[in-house]
Amino acid sequence: MSQDIHLRHSSIRKSSKALAVITAILLVSGLPDAAVANEKKVGKSCNKIGERINLKESYLECRWKSEGKKVYFLLTKIIEDLNPSISPEPYTNCRLPEAIKNRLDGWNSYVSIAYPVVKSTLDPLGSNTYLFIPIDFKDAVGVGSPEKMLRTEVKKIYEWLDWYSNGKVSIQIDYPKSWLRSSKLASELTTWPDLAKPSSPGDKLSGISLVEALLADVEQTYDLSKYQGVYFLPSLAAKSLEHGVFLNNTFKTPKGSFTGGGYIYGNSAFEREEFVWAFIIHDFLHSFGLALHAPGQELPFGIQDTTFGGLGINEWDTMSLGWTNDGDVYCVSKENLKTAEIQLVPIEREQKGTQSIMIKLSDTQVLVIESHRRDKWGMKFLPGFYGVSTYLVDTSVQNDPTKPASKSTRFANYIKNTQTNKDRLVNRRYWQETDAKGNRKSGWVTQPTWDMDYILFENESLVTNGIKITLKKSGHNDLVRIERAQ
């Protein structure tokens, strides 16, 4: 969000209607010719998505519309909270329980896809404590001040958790001012190739043995019993530690044992230009008990599966963690559905209002409709981006990360609109190739990326499961109509 655009919460006193009218008349009458000409561009065609024309109290922004059009949208510089739409049913009616009958084995067997989550190492409701350790090695010396870097990242983690949990969870994160030197050499350790195998690849420590080796160094300075997990951030020079490690386990240490999270930040994420805080939040959400990784399909609509677009949490996962408040969800069962128009708040923005529309289709399926924007928690979206996504949740399906995303391998999937024919979004994309020995090549390329038929622009409709979903009007928020399909 640019610095000249502000979010005004409802607690701020609004100007009287009469004063607003008088002010508007004075402003318009005093506008120079150029400003009047710009005002007339609203709804007219434009060339570059994200282009802005600044006005006195508002601005024009070039955005997509239906039929591939690019037009100017008029947007105010102040964004106010919205009153939530009155939900026909309690949101708990759409909070379907898990209904998996034949559970798959693997790391994802102990995480949850629905409410209530089975708590892992972090409590999704209440207070938690964590230890961040910037760690370096004699053969991979750390550079710079880890305290300076972590201060910024930890602040972001606190802000994200406070907003998306509605203040229902907190984490106290401790970290040292300088690098902690490991007794091991980086060349003795590896996070490659297969962390799921208990045995170490070659003569290097990996997996549980790797975490235990690093915990032994930490235990000399910190009382591990005070923490629910330790997150290691290796020096960038430690090239053998380029892949993340995510383990919730009981680890052996020289002083006994430690039960909790043992994570290693995949420092190749710096090459991918990922935010450190977002990478860690994703891991924390697993530790709260979430399966994540659905809906995904390489679409940039949430921290559950990507760190390249919107970095908010979708309302289904929010609800599964017990973070949802009354008014956050417009819930209705399909048999009770009547035509309605609901104003949605983008999940990437800190704005009060209705966050999601949910339509219960059966005892195991629910449609979820959400709005997206480039905003505080979505700054990796391109300027001018907006849209409404729809995904289907099926609580009888367990994630199977060994197979491509589909209705039978993911509990949630975004729905593609077969009635539109948009281009793929052209954007920078990171690529990497790794051979059998773990040697990596990587870089960036600008090319068509994800399919924009997975989102609705203004005046577009999607028909699915007997429901018609239309984005009637868009601005700072999205006015969505839901009705039975004819």
How should these model regions be labeled?
Residues 34-37:
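Boundary at the C-terminal end of the N-terminal hydrophobic targeting segment
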Residues 4-20:
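Bacterial N-terminal signal peptides that target proteins for export
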Residues 56-64:
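Extracellular disulfide-bonded cysteine-rich modules/repeats
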